[in-house]
Every structure is written in structure tokens, then in C-alpha cells.
From Swiss-Prot:
Family: Belongs to the transferase hexapeptide repeat family. LpxA subfamily.
UniProt gene name: lpxA
Native organism: Psychromonas ingrahamii (strain DSM 17664 / CCUG 51855 / 37)
Domain of life: Bacteria
Higher taxonomy: Bacteria, Pseudomonadati, Pseudomonadota, Gammaproteobacteria, Alteromonadales
UniProt enzyme class: transferase
Role summary: Involved in the biosynthesis of lipid A, a phosphorylated glycolipid that anchors the lipopolysaccharide to the outer membrane of the cell.
Protein name: Acyl-[acyl-carrier-protein]--UDP-N-acetylglucosamine O-acyltransferase
InterPro entries: Acetyltransf_C (IPR029098), Acetyltransf_C_sf (IPR037157), Hexapep (IPR001451), Lipid_A_LpxA (IPR010137), Trimer_LpxA-like_sf (IPR011004)
Keyword NAD annotated: no
Any single GO BP term: lipid A biosynthetic process
Length: 262
């Protein structure tokens, strides 16, 4: 069902079962597939392909040659019904690829709100992205990767399957990420290593000086004092009272499964 108020170029192909919101613009030669739902005020450039089942919210911008909601590249995928869910006000630049989930996980790839995916970014099956994330050109997320809010990933970086990146973490360009990166950390390298606390980013985001100081102390405990991970957990746990930001870090390292970048 297509609402008349949408502006659809005559060369675009929109499936009869697609649901198009108000004030949506769809450019030339774009293909909108079956079971695709596009929210209000979205802008879709020429030569975009969106395949369903995909649901996106309002205010998203998708640039030319992006492929959104395609089948995943997991060799175990056998045509099962899987999904892609996208929130509001995201930007997908040229040639981005975002794949639907797999039956082996939750079946759904999820992207939150206000994210910027620059040119040639790849988001694989079953990834979960929060809000206010920046993925620079050619950043690649393997399957089942999870990014918390306010993460920044530099260009040409690649994240291994099942890795997690905590909130406000920053990854330098050309990095190979094979372990979890805790909240607030900066990390870079091949393979990636911790490089300190993202102090500038935290200040810009309104973190107070006390919280940043406690995060830096926790970083030293984890990465610079020679503690085992279990020893570091015990020492950080002793400092949690009155610092919710530190609680976020502590909870993250307690849930690690691939190891922590240190």
C-alpha cells in the first residue's frame, strides 16, 4: 500500500505489499521489495535496494547503491524467515550493506536511532546497534556483533563475530577487533589493544570530572597494573558506590565471553 503523498520516481519499483509512510521520497531505479515498511519522512536515493522483511522508522536517509535487508552471507542460512529492524533518523551512505538475521540467533538484525553509517560500511546478520553510533568508511561488522550507544569506529576497521563494544568506546582506523572493548575505552591496532580512556568524548557528552577520574582509575586496574581479569573485577567492584558510570563498565567486563581488550 503506497500513500499518495509519497514522491516515488516513475522508474522506481515498489512492491504492492510494501508500506510507505508520508512524505517519503524514493529516487530513480530504486527497488523496494515485499514486506518492506518505510516510516514517514524517509529519503531514499536512486539505485537503492531494500528487501524484506524490513521495517524502518521515520527520517532515515539512504544513499545510492546501498543494499538494505538482503539475505545474510552465513553459510548456514537456508532461506528461513528473518528480519531487519531500523529505528529513526539514521543515515546510510553510498554502498552500505545491511543484512537480515539468522535462525541460529534471534533472527533479527537491529539498528537503533541517529546512527551514521558512512560509505561501504557492512553490518552483517544478527548485529545489534544502539543509538548515536558512527561507523566510518569501510568499517565491517561480522555477524552477531553488538555496539552500545555512542560508539565510534574508524575507517577500514573490522570486528570479529560476537564481539561487543561498550558505550562511548572509540576504535581507531584500520583496527582488527577480536575481543570485547569495554565502555569508555579507546583502542586501536591489529590486533586491537587498549590505548586509554576516551576522555575528550566523555567530556563532550557531559560526564563530570569525578566520573572520568573513576573511569581512568578502573582503566589502570584493568590494563596497567598487571592484574588478572578476576583480580581487576574485585578491585573495581570496591569502587562502584556512587558512580553509576563505573557500574556500566563493571557489568560489561563481567559479561565478557571473547575476552577483554586490555
Amino acid at each position: 500500500m503506497t500513500k499518495k503523498i509519497a514522491m516515488i520516481h516513475p522508474t522506481a519499483i515498489v512492491h504492492e505489499n510494501a508500506i510507505i509512510g508520508k512524505d517519503v521520497e524514493i529516487g530513480p531505479y530504486t527497488i523496494i521489495g515485499d514486506r518492506v515498511e518505510i516510516g514517514d519522512n524517509c529519503w531514499i536515493a536512486p539505485h537503492v535496494v531494500i528487501k524484506g522483511p524490513t521495517k524502518m522508522g521515520k527520517g532515515n536517509k539512504i544513499y545510492q547503491f546501498a543494499s538494505i535487508g538482503e539475505d545474510c552471507q552465513d553459510l548456514k542460512y537456508n532461506g528461513e524467515e528473518t528480519f531487519l529492524e531500523i529505528g529513526d533518523n539514521n543515515v546510510f551512505r553510498e554502498s552500505c550493506t545491511v543484512h537480515r538475521g539468522t535462525a541460529q540467533d534471534q533472527g533479527t538484525t537491529r539498528i537503533g536511532n541517529n546512527n551514521l553509517l558512512m560509505a561501504y560500511v557492512h553490518v552483517a546478520h544478527d548485529c545489534v546497534l544502539g543509538n548515536n553510533i558512527i561507523l566510518s568508511n569501510n568499517a565491517t561488522l561480522a555477524g552477531h556483533t553488538k555496539l552500545a550507544n555512542n560508539v565510534i569506529i574508524g575507517g577500514l576497521s573490522a570486528l570479529h563475530q560476537f564481539t561487543r563494544v561498550g558505550e562511548f568506546a572509540m576504535i581507531g582506523g584500520c583496527s582488527a577487533v577480536n575481543k570485547d572493548i569495554p565502555p569508555y575505552f579507546m583502542a586501536t591496532g591489529n590486533y586491537v589493544e587498549a590505548q586509554g580512556v576516551n576522555s575528550v568524548g566523555l567530556k563532550r557528552s557531559g560526564f563530570n570530572s569525578k566520573a572520568i577520574m573513576e573511569i581512568k582509575r578502573a582503566y589502570k586496574i584493568l590494563c596497567r597494573e598487571g592484574n588478572s581479569l578476576e583480580q581487576a573485577k574485585i578491585k573495581i567492584a570496591e569502587k562502584l558506590e556512587g558512580c553509576p558510570e563505573l557500574q556500566v563498565l563493571y557489568d560489561f567486563i563481567c559479561e565478557e565471553s571473547r575476552g577483554i581488550v586490555r
